[in-house]
Amino acid sequence: MFRILYLFVLCGAVSASIFNFMHDQYQHQEPRHEVSFEQRVLESNCDKYLCPGTLECVARPQDCPCPYPSSQMRCVLPNGDPLCISKPTGDYNGKYDDPAKNWKVDAKDDNVRDCGWVKRAWEGRV
């Protein structure tokens, strides 16, 4: 009985020691001096429109790219506002990969969430 109790106490002490060691490893890292988002906006030399999600300088808000172009596509709502959505998953032979053309694709299938689906949803047809 005492052996089992001793084993539990020993295991607890070892795990606490390992936890403290790991905790100390993270405490002694040098702090990173990252420039804040606000600072990057203020230091921007953009004389046109500065996209809020990517800090790209473009002519108008409708030209803002999506923050994650490999997994998102930009759709333009009927009122002209841009909207980034996740690209449809599945085997679509890369037709959603080109940002210059993917917003034109409409699978005409309400199970495929592409820009055509967004337009139909905007119009209340979904």
From Swiss-Prot:
- The name this protein goes by in its record: Long chronological lifespan protein 2
Matching PANTHER family: LONG CHRONOLOGICAL LIFESPAN PROTEIN 2 (PTHR38425:SF1)
Q: Which UniProt keywords apply?
A: Signal
Q: Name the source's superkingdom.
A: Eukaryota
Which species expresses this protein natively? Answer: Clavispora lusitaniae (strain ATCC 42720)
Protein function? Probable component of the endoplasmic reticulum-associated degradation (ERAD) pathway.
Q: Name one GO biological process term.
A: ERAD pathway
Q: What are the annotated disulfide bridges? A: none
Please state the span of the N-terminal signal peptide per the UniProt entry. 1-16
UniProt gene name: LCL2
Family to which this protein belongs = Belongs to the LCL2 family.
